[in-house]
């Protein structure tokens, strides 16, 4: 594939120990040699070496930066192209100067995700692996990064390719049947083979889809909203679960003015914890904005931790709030058990019915273990599956697998009903195409461009 040479800063902007300018393409080494002065020309050094030298402005002869330059030659690189990585000091001005020089002498500024896109276009990775690269970068827990790494290593790709190969074998048998319609024994054997193989493929698709709910939680975190009246201990609960003092804990109602968010691993379950401003009527403009954001967070939650104050009797406000959340997945927490009990637990149970109830003291860190176990049990049936399993965690993949499952069921129904094989062939071909979209072999250029546009610059 004949592509130009691209360049970008591949480290976060800002001050730091190191900043890296990356080039990829057929002229990467040539462009770098125009700027680099060291013991040897970069064109003459072995691949996969790091070389000390300086970046010189060819026009002014000014020494721009002291650098270490990595030389990586095709095809054993991420993009399967020649790659140069110029390791600079991490100052903003200097690294931008080096970037500008690479563009002045022949490179083009890379688009977001273009390095990974080239890895895909050059056959280094498939589309599902490319998507997993971004999942890995964005992962907030160890479990999420492990699931993404498994996909980068090609575990999902291998399963999809295996099913596509099985479909090709069915299609080959169907072709024999179409070519020799006069032989009844061929038709019978084809139908039997088609049904047997199709049901196995459907079973494998179902197995993958069964991991979808957990996979999505692993990837995105279980969106968990802590809600309750002001000053019932919501921020203390957030701090205890994340074991940090991120939220301001005071005795003043309305202290949390915004939605606070934190990722935490709770007994193997990655939570995206959201501490909301207390939902109440208020004239404070800033607090009012926080309340509106709280309502939005509630509407998007997977789990709601509804907090009550042991030191106060239930109020109409508690009833009103619970009415808002009662049809969701809720755990009710009666907090501040270290204080005098003024709440009627039986009244609480009457209000919440069969909803799980936990009693805690965030001040004394009591009841937290029970709460964590309840969260795990509610979503994972008491057991979090092995993170080394192959999970389907991407919404696009889940949608395509559901389409494939329906289409293969259509093919099974058609074959069992005696529909002509050339009609069944249409469904089988469509399944092969749908599964190909997951790994990018049959994906449209528009889809590919859209997916890679979501990447960051330099990746």
Swiss-Prot record:
SUPFAM superfamilies assigned to the protein according to its UniProt record, in alphabetical order: P-loop containing nucleoside triphosphate hydrolases (SSF52540), TrmE connector domain (SSF116878)
EC numbers on record: 3.6.-.-
Cofactor-binding details, from the entry: Binds 1 potassium ion per subunit.
Binding site residues for K(+): 231, 250, 252, 255
PROSITE patterns: G_TRME
Main localisation: cytoplasm
Protein name: tRNA modification GTPase MnmE
